[in-house]
Amino acid sequence: MLVFSFLFVVVSINLNALIFLCKKSWASYLFLYLYNFFFCEDEYKLTKNCVRVEAIAPFMMCLGSLGAILGKQRTANFLLLSYNVINNPVVLVYYVENFSRINFIKHTTKEKSVIWTNERQLNPWICN
């Protein structure tokens, strides 16, 4: 467990480590599981891929698709797709290969909670 915790910390703070994990499907699932276990509240655990966006710095710029970085736009195991700097909260969307569809993260702002469930709804947020 200590090894997994250390791995999680490294991945959380090191984009290079994250890109490395993206190349391994088992590591992608492990990363999502650890993120879910340590940082997701009960309501968020209803989704397979969740993250507490409150912990993400709002000044982050568009990172684009990790799939593009890896040269695998549509087939990468793990993609970091979008963000929102207009209204401050940063929205991270994860796509894991073999999911039947892209599942979007439920994130909470001060005004309301939002769930995106398909790509069309997310289009304004995607960074290409």
UniProtKB/Swiss-Prot annotation:
Record keywords, A-Z: Membrane, Transmembrane, Transmembrane helix
The keyword 4Fe-4S is assigned to this record: no
Transmembrane segments: 1-21, 51-71, 76-96
Subcellular location: Membrane
Isomerase found in the keyword field: no
Membrane topology: Multi-pass membrane protein
GO annotations of cellular component type: membrane
Location, primary (coarse class): membrane
Miscellaneous section: Partially overlaps YML089C.
Name listed for the protein in its UniProt record: Putative uncharacterized protein YML090W
Organism taxonomic ancestry: Eukaryota, Fungi, Dikarya, Ascomycota, Saccharomycotina
